[in-house]
Amino acid sequence: MKHFEANFDGLVGPTHNYAGLSFGNVASLSNAALVSNPKAAAKQGLQKAKALADMGMVQGMLAPQERPDLYTLRRIGFSGSDANVLKQAAKEAPMLLNACCSASSMWTANAATVSPSADTRDGKLHFTPANLVDKLHRSIEPLTTGRILTATFSDPHYFHHHSHLPEHNSFGDEGAANHTRLCNEYGHAGVELFVYGQEATNPNAPKPQKYPARQTLEASMAVARLHQLEEDNCVFIQQNPDVIDQGVFHNDVIAVGNQNVLFYHEQAFLNTQHKIDEIKRKLDTELYFIEVPTAKVAINDAVKSYLFNTQIITLPSGEMVIVAPTDCQENPAVFAYLNELLTLNTPIKQVLYFDVKQSMQNGGGPACLRLRVAMNEMEVAAVNQHTLMNDALFARLNLWVDKHYRDRLTTQDLADPQLIIESRTALDELTQIMKLGSVYQFQR
């Protein structure tokens, strides 16, 4: 049976804007108040997804969240007509309105943690939506995320869906952005690397001082239990608190893995060698640990260019390729390193560059935009086929974006009642295109 690693990219929502909501994310804060282009953002994401599909990769799309989120605004006391709710919130609590209009669900690396059937005791693919409790604008996503995932991976014979973890900082969970999987072949049992920022229940353990550690060890261990993983399938690694304080808010900003390759910065982890030894003990295959020295790429350059927020994919030919943002080309140190990497004795043979600047300016590169799902061909056949990228879906979604999306949006525009109508009309049509059913609150 054939096995693949599918990528499910987040479709950028109609309210994509730059409100600077993500403390600890340097790009998000530094680009606050820029004028965004939702239409361009959605099309950049679709172009990347289609390019991977054209390379023979299994590529899907995940629908965005409903925004503005009027249900949350009503929960916190704003009332009256929909237009009045927006008007009140804009006047009395503009930052709360901004949080309820964020298109951050485009970064599906934070949608959930996924464990493939080759690793789990019941032989099913497991999904746990991330609770994202550290950021208000993301903490309102998990229920809808769960519905979208269930509508996409709907066959209970193959897919096991869990609820998100308790909504408390002790179980702060940011999903696949702090999780990667090493293996020989995608269909073979592998080792899942759970990277955490702090131990919530141990006040003496190392933790960052400036920016929050969004992922706890307790959350990572809970997900491993839910997914029925054996101890021999798991390695728990602490991210270096110093790099979190330099803007590395998720592990996928400082490390990325694929099959038998782990590509990471030398400052990425604590106790790096000890953990590499544990991985080698638990995974009996030839492994490539590609450590990038600070002398060649400083942390600041890694964060600005998103060198590690790249995708490493294995093409159907067996060739391993890095999918990088064009920002990596524009950074001399990073571009020089990537050119050098191709001359080294590793499986990575090519770098492909994509323009995802609308996402990058909000702090999300190519790896943020995708949720990885290792699957066999029977599981791929059980996926909602209307979510899988092909020529027809690409054309239809581009027309849908042209029809419904603005090409200019400011934070002041978020109070425009017309945005509610535009967004709901677009999403209602999208659920028909992708055959998702009633996943949104306004449809229920």
From Swiss-Prot:
<dbReference type="GO" id="GO:0019544">
    <property type="term" value="P:arginine catabolic process to glutamate"/>
</dbReference>
<comment type="pathway">
    <text>Amino-acid degradation; L-arginine degradation via AST pathway; L-glutamate and succinate from L-arginine: step 2/5.</text>
</comment>
<feature type="active site">
    <location>
        <position position="174"/>
    </location>
</feature>
<dbReference type="InterPro" id="IPR037031">
    <property type="entry name" value="AstB_sf"/>
</dbReference>
<dbReference type="Pfam" id="PF04996">
    <property type="entry name" value="AstB"/>
</dbReference>
<feature type="active site">
    <location>
        <position position="250"/>
    </location>
</feature>
<comment type="function">
    <text>Catalyzes the hydrolysis of N(2)-succinylarginine into N(2)-succinylornithine, ammonia and CO(2).</text>
</comment>
<feature type="binding site">
    <location>
        <position position="252"/>
    </location>
    <ligand>
        <name>substrate</name>
    </ligand>
</feature>
<comment type="similarity">
    <text>Belongs to the succinylarginine dihydrolase family.</text>
</comment>
<feature type="binding site">
    <location>
        <begin position="19"/>
        <end position="28"/>
    </location>
    <ligand>
        <name>substrate</name>
    </ligand>
</feature>
<comment type="subunit">
    <text>Homodimer.</text>
</comment>
<feature type="binding site">
    <location>
        <position position="362"/>
    </location>
    <ligand>
        <name>substrate</name>
    </ligand>
</feature>
<dbReference type="GO" id="GO:0019545">
    <property type="term" value="P:arginine catabolic process to succinate"/>
</dbReference>
<protein>
    <recommendedName>
        <fullName>N-succinylarginine dihydrolase</fullName>
        <ecNumber>3.5.3.23</ecNumber>
    </recommendedName>
</protein>
<feature type="binding site">
    <location>
        <position position="214"/>
    </location>
    <ligand>
        <name>substrate</name>
    </ligand>
</feature>
<feature type="binding site">
    <location>
        <begin position="137"/>
        <end position="138"/>
    </location>
    <ligand>
        <name>substrate</name>
    </ligand>
</feature>
<dbReference type="GO" id="GO:0009015">
    <property type="term" value="F:N-succinylarginine dihydrolase activity"/>
</dbReference>
<feature type="binding site">
    <location>
        <position position="110"/>
    </location>
    <ligand>
        <name>substrate</name>
    </ligand>
</feature>
<feature type="active site" description="Nucleophile">
    <location>
        <position position="368"/>
    </location>
</feature>
<keyword id="KW-0056">Arginine metabolism</keyword>
<dbReference type="InterPro" id="IPR007079">
    <property type="entry name" value="SuccinylArg_d-Hdrlase_AstB"/>
</dbReference>
<keyword id="KW-0378">Hydrolase</keyword>
